[in-house]
Amino acid sequence: MISTSLLLVVLLFAILAIVDAQWGYGGPYGGYGGGYGGGPWGYGGGWRRRHWGGYGGGPWGGYGGGPWGGYYGK
C-alpha cells in the first residue's frame, strides 16, 4: 500500500502541474516565456502559458504571433 506521505507528495506535484499549465510561472500575467519581446503586455504577457504566452511578436506577444500570442501562434 502507498504511504500517506508519498501520496500527499504526488498530489502536491499534480496540483502544481495543473496550476502551472493554467497560469505559468508568475501569476495572471506571467507565464514561462510569455509575451517575451512584444505586444501590449510585453515580457510575461498572457495568463495561460500554452495559449496566451510564448516569446516575441504579435498583438499580445507569442512566438507565432496571432491575436493572443502563444508559442505556436493563433
Swiss-Prot record:
Which tissues does the record link to its expression? Expressed in hypoderm.
Q: Does the keyword Electron transport apply?
A: no
Q: Which residues form the signal peptide?
A: 1-21
Location within or outside the cell = Secreted
Keyword Secreted part of the UniProt annotation: yes
Alphabetical GO CC annotations of the entry are: extracellular region
User: What are its GO biological-process terms?
Assistant: defense response to fungus; innate immune response; killing of cells of another organism; neuropeptide signaling pathway
What are the inducing conditions?
Strongly up-regulated upon D.coniospora infection.
Q: Which domain of life is it from?
A: Eukaryota
Report the residues modified as Tyrosine amide: 72
Q: Can you list the disulfide-bonded cysteine pairs?
A: none
Q: Which UniProt keywords apply?
A: Amidation, Antimicrobial, Fungicide, Neuropeptide, Secreted, Signal
Annotated function = May have antifungic activity against D.coniospora.
Q: Give the protein family.
A: Belongs to the YARP (YGGW-amide related peptide) family.
What protein does this entry describe? Neuropeptide-like protein 33
Q: Which organism is it from?
A: Caenorhabditis elegans
